[in-house]
Swiss-Prot record:
Any single Gene Ontology cellular-component annotation: cytosolic small ribosomal subunit
Record PTM text: Acylated. Acylation may be a prerequisite for conversion of the monomeric 37 kDa laminin receptor precursor (37LRP) to the mature dimeric 67 kDa laminin receptor (67LR), and may provide a mechanism for membrane association. Cleaved by stromelysin-3 (ST3) at the cell surface. Cleavage by stromelysin-3 may be a mechanism to alter cell-extracellular matrix interactions.
Renumbered residue ranges of the record's region Laminin-binding: 161-180, 205-229, 242-295
Organism for this UniProt entry: Bos taurus
Keywords tagged on the record: Acetylation, Cell membrane, Cytoplasm, Isopeptide bond, Membrane, Nucleus, Phosphoprotein, Receptor, Repeat, Ribonucleoprotein, Ribosomal protein, Ubl conjugation
Residue span of region Interaction with PPP1R16B: 54-113
Subunit (UniProt): Monomer (37LRP) and homodimer (67LR). Component of the small ribosomal subunit. Mature ribosomes consist of a small (40S) and a large (60S) subunit. The 40S subunit contains about 33 different proteins and 1 molecule of RNA (18S). The 60S subunit contains about 49 different proteins and 3 molecules of RNA (28S, 5.8S and 5S). Interacts with RPS21. Interacts with several laminins including at least LAMB1. Interacts with MDK. The mature dimeric form interacts with PPP1R16B (via its fourth ankyrin repeat). Interacts with PPP1CA only in the presence of PPP1R16B.
Protein name as catalogued: Small ribosomal subunit protein uS2
Family from the record: Belongs to the universal ribosomal protein uS2 family.
Function (record text): Required for the assembly and/or stability of the 40S ribosomal subunit. Required for the processing of the 20S rRNA-precursor to mature 18S rRNA in a late step of the maturation of 40S ribosomal subunits. Also functions as a cell surface receptor for laminin. Plays a role in cell adhesion to the basement membrane and in the consequent activation of signaling transduction pathways. May play a role in cell fate determination and tissue morphogenesis. Also acts as a receptor for several other ligands, including the pathogenic prion protein, viruses, and bacteria.
Cross-link Glycyl lysine isopeptide (Lys-Gly) (interchain with G-Cter in SUMO2) mapped to chain: 89
Residues carrying Phosphoserine: 43
Site (Cleavage): 115-116, 133-134
Molecular-function GO terms, alphabetical: laminin binding; laminin receptor activity; structural constituent of ribosome
């Protein structure tokens, strides 16, 4: 599809992105219409998607999107969680109309519905999950583009982009690649310079994981503040000039104090014992006499 134009050939960095995101990994089941996009089958039963065919169909889909004069006439849909963020990012970059979440039946066919719209092109993430918009597109003669896995049905799909539409990284990377090629074909960005938007912004993230990361970051910040408050207090600044002493032995005079000698006693000698019985007897006699005089 890219032909002999070297500008449209797949670069090595693009191949590395596809391999890192697992875009080439299909499922264990194979639809008969997807056989043309299969490269080989692994020993565990997983089919390998030919990335060359993926790149060719990606360029064809980008050309179809660029052919629409009004970007808002392109509807991009993803009912699965893994593609909702990528759809919103793609719509913000290219100007398309996103439908993230549940698709209201009758959006393309029921004219009295509040959400009724008449797009000129439809792009879906999964033909099996987004079967309702594909069916309604067939009623109003609407061309469709779909990211198709090895087991995806190709009924009502006009341009099938073979890729892994189950993994969050693969779906986000495919929408990022499609948005980049659309902007390049429109002339918004140059092919000589890399796009400043990273594919990570198109990846789906679980809200529980985001909440856990935010809590961990908050706890880490609080712990860091407490540590700094206890151990990294600002040291007092001394601005007074300190006296300079050349020789500390000369600067301080230490007075000499004579050492007092105490006589040594022999603690082993037994102390002299006194007769305490005589004195109490004499005192008792005196008290007796005193009491006699009172009587």
């Amino acid at each position: 599809m890219s032909g002999a134009l070297d500008v449209l050939q797949m670069k090595e960095e693009d191949v590395l992105k596809f391999l890192a995101a697992g875009t080439h990994l299909g499922g264990t089941n194979l639809d008969f219409q997807m056989e043309q996009y299969i490269y080989k089958r692994k020993s565990d039963g997983i089919y390998i998607i030919n990335l060359k065919r993926t790149w060719e169909k990606l360029l064809l889909a980008a050309r179809a999107i660029v052919a629409i004069e009004n970007p808002a006439d392109v509807s991009v849909i993803s009912s699965r969680n893994t593609g909702q963020r990528a759809v919103l990012k793609f719509a913000a970059a290219t100007g398309a109309t996103p439908i993230a979440g549940r698709f209201t039946p009758g959006t393309f066919t029921n004219q009295i519905q509040a959400a009724f719209r008449e797009p000129r092109l439809l792009v879906v993430t999964d033909p099996r999950a987004d079967h309702q918009p594909l069916t309604e597109a067939s009623y109003v003669n609407l061309p469709t583009i779909a990211l198709c896995n090895t087991d995806s049905p190709l009924r009502y799909v006009d341009i099938a982009i073979p890729c892994n539409n189950k993994g969050a990284h693969s779906v986000g990377l495919m929408w990022w690649m499609l948005a980049r090629e659309v902007l390049r074909m429109r002339g918004t960005i140059s092919r000589e310079h890399p796009w400043e938007v990273m594919p990570d912004l198109y990846f789906y993230r679980d809200p529980e994981e985001i909440e856990k990361e935010e809590q961990a970051a908050a706890e880490k910040a609080v712990t860091k503040e407490e540590f700094q408050g206890e151990w990294t207090a600002p040291a007092p600044e001394f601005t007074a000039a300190q006296p300079e002493v050349a020789d500390w032995s000369e600067g301080v005079q230490v007075p000499s104090v004579p050492i007092q000698q105490f006589p040594t006693e022999d603690w082993s000698a037994q102390p002299s014992t006194e007769d305490w019985s005589a004195a109490p007897t004499a005192q008792a006699t005196e008290w007796v006499g005193t009491t006699t005089e009172w009587s």
